[in-house]
Amino acid sequence: MSIRKTGIVFQRFGKQFKVFVENQTLVAFAQKKLQWKRDFKLLVGDKVTLENGVIVAVEERKNTLVRPKVVNVDQVVIVQSLIEPKINWQQLFKLLIHFHAQNVARLVLVITKNDLEFEPAEKARLSELTSFGYQLFFTAPNADLPLTLFTELQNRFSVFMGQSGVGKSSLINRLDSQIHQAIQALSAHQFGKNTTTSTVMFPFQNGFICDTPGFNVIDFPNLKQLAAQHFVGFASLIGQCHFSNCTHQSEKGCFIVSAVTQKSYSLWLYESYLKLIN
């Protein structure tokens, strides 16, 4: 008699998959017909059906991230520092564009190393982002983590990602001491060394946390086209542009350019958009 169960893929190694099933961890193989499907690969976050320890079906995905390669994400937690390493706004905007385009419902920004001195203008820019619905938290090594951060993570599949050296793995360890991640100090050149080498998922407060490899530079396909639709704050404005394919530069009837002129949309954000696409 076959026994069918449902679970979530949380790690892949070779042709084997680790799957959370009823609060247990099972090691499973994918059925051959799944392996033979063209351009299909099981990914961390896939909701699967197992039959006698073999993955026989995969549920339709609600979203698919390119970097990291994770699916069915409820929210992304972008971990960033303002200094050591200095915040890279262009990289942050690229991430926000990608996640908006992939219909990630919630985006959370966690700023680490808040005990270090940094330019007040940088903090003001971050606060400006909260007006567009992003959740913002500040943390420091010797201070307790905000309780509201724990609340944000409950009952959700949260993917953590960030530039190398910002303290992403250290933050996860503080959230749950049982999630042990290797930590390395910043290199002499102020670039962090990746402490996470693969995408891994952990149970956390009735949800999951997914740690991902750090990065120094990251790019996504079709970024310019996606930016015109998904840049910060554009969603409520682009429908009022005269042309549906408006790139928000010099086109006649661009509502975003008009909003910048009338100071109802941030000049700093608009200039950041132009820098990104040009």
Curated annotation (Swiss-Prot):
Any single Pfam family the record assigns to this protein: RsgA_GTPase
Places the protein is found: Cytoplasm
Binding positions (Zn(2+)): 241, 246, 248, 254
PROSITE patterns found in the cross-reference section: ENGC_GTPASE, G_CP
Co-factor requirement: Zn(2+)
InterPro entries documented for this protein: G_CP_dom, P-loop_NTPase, Ribosome_biogen_GTPase_RsgA, RsgA_GTPase_dom
Gene3D superfamilies found in the cross-reference section: P-loop containing nucleotide triphosphate hydrolases (3.40.50.300), Probable gtpase engc, domain 3 (1.10.40.50)
BP term (GO), one: ribosomal small subunit biogenesis
Domain spans labelled CP-type G: 62-218
Subunit structure: Monomer. Associates with 30S ribosomal subunit, binds 16S rRNA.
PANTHER family (UniProt xref): SMALL RIBOSOMAL SUBUNIT BIOGENESIS GTPASE RSGA, SMALL RIBOSOMAL SUBUNIT BIOGENESIS GTPASE RSGA 1, MITOCHONDRIAL-RELATED
Name of the protein in question: Small ribosomal subunit biogenesis GTPase RsgA
Organism field: Mycoplasma pneumoniae (strain ATCC 29342 / M129 / Subtype 1)
Gene: rsgA
